[in-house]
Amino acid sequence: MTWWNRRNTKAITMLVKQIAALTAMLTVLSCAGCATSSPNDNEQSQSSDSSQTHEQVKKSAEQSIDGAHLRDNESLYKVYDDSGVETMYLTVSRGNSSEGTDHSWSEINQYSVDDYAAMGVDRYKVNGLLQVGDEQGPVSGELGFGESAPNATVQIRGQSSSKNEQKNYKIELKSGKGKWRGQRTIALNKHMGEGLRFRNKMAYDLIKGIDQMMGLRTQFVHLYVKDETSGSDSFDDYGLYTQVEQLNKTALQVHGLD
């Protein structure tokens, strides 16, 4: 080993010893402020705890959810007969800008959700008069019978389905204008992508018979529309729709899930 290498080795050894000494010193200093509990402290704490008094309360026994089951409100499906086809008559008219209903029926059916996103506006609405009846016309005792003023607003519903030629509709009954089967929001789905047009309702009907499964009320609807925004004075046949109960606070309440 050369003189130069011996000198470097000696310097490195000294540096390592200095680092070790500095580390030990820092360790001692870091613990200098550590507090230790004395027997007197423990005695004072125990004395303080023993001097406290408590007010007695009665607690209910803990209830286990192991035996609880999710159950739908079965009686809800027995109130109305949903095995047939309900007939609805919808008269649409132009409203006003303050309610966002100052649009034509053609505009409602023209745009998809992508169009609204590109325009940066909410979905257009029109005024609507919804009446329920049979193939002969609105029936007394049913929603909208004998009325001429709008009782609802109408807009398209759905996402990708809004691009279809035949639209799905959301009919929102106005406050104080009544309800249809306890519902103010009536969703009508066309199911253009489903050739049979009945599988959605069939699925909900099957769910009703399965324990611990939650369903929604459904109904086939034959829809007629009179477009007063274009000057029409007669109802056009829009064909078969599936009405599906809107999953909102009202639905959660009647199904016992609120």
Label every PLM stretch briefly.
Residues 1-14:
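N-terminal secretory signal peptides that target proteins for export/translocation
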Residues 6-7, 19-20, 39:
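Generic early N-terminus positional signal peaking at residue ~5-7
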Residues 34-258:
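Phosphate/dinucleotide-binding and metal-coordinating scaffold of catalytic cores
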Residues 15-36:
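Sec-dependent N-terminal signal peptides of Gram-positive bacterial secreted proteins and lipoproteins
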